[in-house]
Amino acid sequence: MTDQGENEKKQRRSNATIAVACLSFFVCMIGAAYASVPLYRIFCQVTGYGGTTQRVEQYSDTILDKTIKVRFDANIANGLPWDFKPMQREVTVRIGETTMIKYEAHNLFGEETYGRASFNVAPGRAGAYFNKVECFCFTDNTLKPGEDLELPVVFFVDPEFVNDPDLKDVKTITLSYTFFPIDKPKPVVNAKAVGSTRNGG
């Protein structure tokens, strides 16, 4: 009986060890999954991988004679009652030339709604050379009931585009946006105003 009891205790300890190991592995996998999203986003922004465009603060100093066609695509995710489309379907621009185009959005719902745009470029490798100076995708967007909103994008294609051997046959780039519904943005608290109110009270 004693040997049997010891064996049962060892078995329970072994089972408990396995359970703890499995739980730890599961928790680590969840943590890795959550961490991989922002890390992947940062990687894409730095390298242009997956068609992620680049955000820049200044215009190109060089404009080439070579031109490229840029097409514009618009999509709406489920749950966002907007009509969203480019105001022009395509433009032909000189590489390095700064260009502004506009999308437009219309709220079809009877209440205020909120959207956030994701974006990518095709072919994916071209994303490393597609630079946006201004874009509605940099911030969240709010539309009142029935409101129409023009959404500008200011961009240029980096002149280094022509030096990439993998893109030598590319004549057209497609810039695509998808709007997703989001919760109502939280109001920004004015710390100075709050402090003044407290001091005055």
Swiss-Prot record:
Membrane topology label = Single-pass type II membrane protein
Q: Which Gene3D superfamilies match?
A: Ctag/Cox11 (2.60.370.10)
As for subcellular location, the record says:
Cell inner membrane
Pfam families in the record, alphabetically?
CtaG_Cox11 (PF04442)
One cellular component GO annotation, for this chain's record?
plasma membrane
Q: Could you list the residue ranges that cross the membrane?
A: 14-36
Query: In terms of one coarse class, where is the protein primarily found?
Result: membrane
UniProt KW tRNA processing keyword? no
Q: What does this protein do?
A: Exerts its effect at some terminal stage of cytochrome c oxidase synthesis, probably by being involved in the insertion of the copper B into subunit I.
Specify the protein name. Cytochrome c oxidase assembly protein CtaG
